[in-house]
């Protein structure tokens, strides 16, 4: 309890609340099917609080710890109820027979035999009337002469099929495909061979207007991304380089080949392909650098930071609203709002608040691999930076190198157990890989923006394109050299119990190192 009290009254109280909320969601997921009624949960909560009060009173604990315990239990209960309500929501009642459906394409991926489209439905035909429906489904279309044409986001489809709920399909590592579809807002699956038709551009636009406001914004942003991706076709680079650039800058990984994914996985640099705080932070830093003269005027601070918030969310929509990018978008939004008032805010509190907001909207997000890896890595970095400052308080030369190595090692250690559990691999030379990938990513993000902005200047765009192609070649050659090193990737298959033990050990090591750093700080205080 003293640790809880110190955490709550310390500098990161929101982190304490977020952990309590997460524990409630995890408990609800584990035992929610046994306890799923509010009339059971609330008395259970009151009973636990009563036992906690007796325990504190018996041990002679401070009275000020009781509110901390009550707040903790309250957020555990809120997390428990949030997940229970989410899990008990009824599934969509799909018609039992085939119907004529219409909707807009959201995204497209390909397999050897089919094209798999995520379709945002608008309506289906029931007799002589149209029944409105706003759900997303995966539509698998058998490849043929008509399906060979390229689908684009926003295109309207008319198809005759029966939609079913996703079938449970669990991989050996515990990945549940049906739950993954549900977490991504997909409520059904269907297959058509030839009974489908793509509507005209005019019909697609009319159908798009019948979508919800959020879906319209998403489809508009994806259409804009498609136009930007077409400009990458002018690059003097091979298809693999263009695929990497599309993933690094616009979050489009639909064209990524298994060999490219394997290369980045073996070198421990897969995180640069998933848009996150690294990419968004570079864009915000560049924007702040350009807007720095305006920040000298107090009246312009609010418009500048509000413009930054608008840019953050435009970029998030443009790149597909991935979990890791949503986390960083919320954190940078909070940072901008604090800066409007002349305050910096605490990064750990911003991280925790971002987690709470995302989990309130969708509690099942807690079990998403991207959510877990993103939050764990950032939590480890933010928790470890004070220790680095304590160990090297006055080092200025080479500080960037020290910070870079520290962040790479800490993020890799924090996510290694989960990466090994989900992907059964561990990259040995991740530091070498990141030393190549991150500087190249900075250059690619900067020059890709110049490339896209110079679309009206063909000569300038060609010069920038050559620079991009050169950086892509350096990135590919460097990572390929790291991947060819002996034992570059180890195959591991830990159990979930082993993963829990690893994190217990990591937490204990963190506590010991933090106490050591605190003692070093006290030792530096002069005595008079």
Language-model segments: what does each one mean?
Residues 29-40, 61-63, 369, 427, ...:
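Membrane-helix interface and helix-disruption motif detector
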Residues 2-7, 64, 73-271:
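Membrane-interface helix/helix-cap signal primarily in integral membrane proteins
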Residues 2-13, 17, 21, 31, ...:
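C-terminal regulatory/interaction regions
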Residues 16, 20, 68, 75-78, ...:
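Small-residue packing motifs within transmembrane alpha-helices
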Residues 379-488:
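Alpha-helical transmembrane segments of multi-pass integral membrane proteins
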Residues 24, 190, 252, 257-430, ...:
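Hydrophobic alpha-helical transmembrane segments in multi-pass membrane proteins
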Residues 2-96:
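Helix-loop-helix transmembrane hairpins and adjacent membrane-interface loops
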Residues 37-47, 373-374, 434-439, 498-500:
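Alpha-helical transmembrane segments of polytopic membrane proteins
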């Amino acid at each position: 309890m003293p640790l809880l009290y110190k955490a709550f009254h310390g500098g990161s109280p929101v982190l304490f609340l977020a952990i309590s909320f997460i524990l409630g969601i995890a408990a609800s997921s584990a035992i929610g099917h046994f306890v799923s009624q509010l009339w059971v949960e609330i008395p259970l909560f009151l009973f636990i609080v009563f036992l906690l009060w007796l325990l504190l009173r018996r041990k002679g604990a401070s009275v000020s710890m009781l509110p901390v315990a009550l707040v903790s239990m309250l957020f555990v209960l809120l997390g428990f109820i949030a997940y229970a309500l989410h899990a008990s929501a009824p599934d969509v009642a799909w018609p039992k027979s085939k119907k004529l459906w219409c909707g807009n394409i959201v995204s497209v991926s390909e397999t050897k035999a089919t094209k798999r489209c995520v379709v945002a439905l608008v309506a289906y035909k029931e007799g002589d009337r149209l029944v409105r429906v706003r759900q997303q489904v995966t539509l698998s279309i058998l490849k043929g002469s008509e399906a060979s044409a390229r689908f684009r986001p926003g295109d309207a489809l008319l198809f005759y099929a029966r939609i079913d709920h996703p079938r449970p399909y669990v991989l050996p590592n515990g990945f549940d495909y049906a739950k993954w579809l549900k977490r991504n807002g997909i409520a059904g699956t269907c297959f058509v061979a030839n009974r489908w038709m793509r509507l005209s551009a005019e019909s697609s636009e009319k159908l798009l207007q019948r979508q919800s406001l959020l879906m319209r914004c998403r489809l508009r942003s994806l259409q804009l991304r498609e136009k930007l991706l077409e400009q990458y076709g002018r690059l003097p680079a091979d298809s693999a380089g263009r695929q990497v650039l599309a993933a690094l800058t616009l979050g489009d990984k639909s064209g990524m080949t298994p060999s490219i994914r394997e290369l980045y996985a073996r070198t421990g640099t897969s995180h640069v392909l998933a848009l996150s705080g690294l990419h968004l932070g570079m864009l915000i830093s560049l924007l702040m650098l350009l807007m720095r003269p305006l920040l000298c005027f107090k009246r312009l601070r609010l418009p500048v930071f509000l413009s930054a918030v608008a840019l953050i969310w435009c970029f998030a929509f443009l790149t597909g609203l991935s979990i890791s990018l949503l986390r960083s978008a919320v954190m940078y939004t909070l940072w901008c709002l604090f800066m409007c008032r002349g305050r910096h805010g605490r990064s750990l509190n911003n991280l925790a608040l971002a987690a709470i907001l995302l989990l309130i909207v969708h509690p099942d997000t807690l079990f998403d691999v991207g959510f877990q890896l993103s939050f764990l890595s950032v939590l480890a970095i933010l928790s470890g930076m004070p220790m680095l400052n304590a160990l090297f308080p006055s080092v200025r030369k080479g500080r960037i190198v020290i910070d870079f190595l520290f962040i790479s090692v800490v993020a890799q250690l924090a996510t290694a157990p989960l990466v090994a559990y989900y992907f059964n691999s561990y990259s040995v030379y991740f530091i070498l890989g990141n030393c190549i990938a991150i500087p190249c990513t900075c250059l690619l993000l900067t020059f890709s923006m110049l490339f896209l902005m110079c679309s009206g200047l063909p000569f300038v765009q060609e010069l920038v394109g050559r620079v991009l192609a050169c950086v892509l070649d350096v990135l590919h050659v460097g990572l390929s050299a790291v991947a060819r090193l002996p034992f570059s990737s180890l195959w591991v298959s830990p159990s979930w119990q082993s993963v829990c033990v690893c994190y217990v050990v990591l937490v204990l090591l963190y506590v010991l190192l933090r106490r050591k750093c605190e003692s070093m700080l006290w030792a530096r205080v002069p005595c008079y």
